[in-house]
Design a protein with these regions (language model features):
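Residue-level signal for inorganic ion chemistry
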Residues: 31, 82, 106, 148, ...
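The conserved Walker
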Residues: 9
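Walker A/P-loop
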Residues: 14
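Hydrophobic anchor at the beta1->P-loop junction of P-loop NTPases
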Residues: 5
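Small-molecule kinase domains that catalyze NTP-dependent phosphoryl transfer to phosphate-bearing small molecules
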Residues: 93-94, 119-120, 136, 143-190, ...
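ATP-dependent NMP and nucleoside kinases share a basic, alpha-helical "lid"
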Residues: 92-99, 104-140
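ATP-dependent small-molecule kinase phosphotransfer cores
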Residues: 32-103
Length: 197
């Protein structure tokens, strides 16, 4: 069973994923899976290197994600090509992890709806915070306001994702309130799974 956690960049998906892990959930982050695909001897490594050349390599021989981002966020065609390579690889890795055992997999999938993957999820949790909080989180990561705005504008609005989700978690709140929301959602999902058995 796949429980997808989605939301825009800087919404707090990783923090929420950690909360679920602390509650005993099996967890995975699609971004981590994608980053793993960029390592040498992984399927995406050779394909991307053949397509863009050595200019996308970091000094340590891995693919430089910042250089790749610079390419794909300047060209819709290059972004579409990258997605056509990466999405099937990431999706298969997530499905493999979900099928390892009977426990539900709580997986952070930032672009769940944009990628058309919502049908693969048994339940969807959407994470929301106000745009200024989201912007401040991205600036704290070292992003310029303009770069953050461009990235946010390239994704679905958080409100649109909320409307399509089974559960919602508001992340622009106190740590305790966030932990309480995660516990309540986790218990509701576990109860629904138990009832369906």
């Amino acid at each position: 069973m796949l429980i997808a956690i989605t939301g825009g960049i800087g919404m707090g998906k990783s923090t929420i994923l950690s909360q679920f892990q602390g509650l005993g959930a099996k967890t995975l982050d699609a971004d981590d899976v994608a980053h793993d695909m960029y390592l040498p001897n992984r399927p995406a490594y050779t394909t991307l290197l053949q397509h863009w050349g050595n200019g996308i390599l970091a000094q340590d021989g891995t693919l430089d994600r910042k250089k790749i981002a610079g390419i794909v966020f300047q060209s819709k065609e290059e972004l579409a090509w990258l997605n056509s390579v990466m999405h099937p690889l990431v999706r298969n890795a997530i499905q493999d992890c979900a099928n390892e055992d009977a426990r539900p997999l709580f997986c952070a999938i930032p672009l769940l709806f944009e990628s058309g993957w919502e049908e693969t999820a048994d339940k969807i949790i959407s994470v929301w915070c106000d745009r200024e909080t989201q912007m401040q989180r991205l600036i704290a990561r070292g992003w310029s306001r303009e770069h953050a705005k461009d990235r946010l504008d390239s994704q679905w609005s958080p409100e649109r994702k909320l409307l399509l989700a089974d559960y919602a978690i508001v992340s622009g709140c106190s740590w305790q309130h966030l932990a309480d929301q995660c516990r309540i959602v986790y218990q509701a999902i576990v109860a629904s799974i138990t009832q369906s058995l």
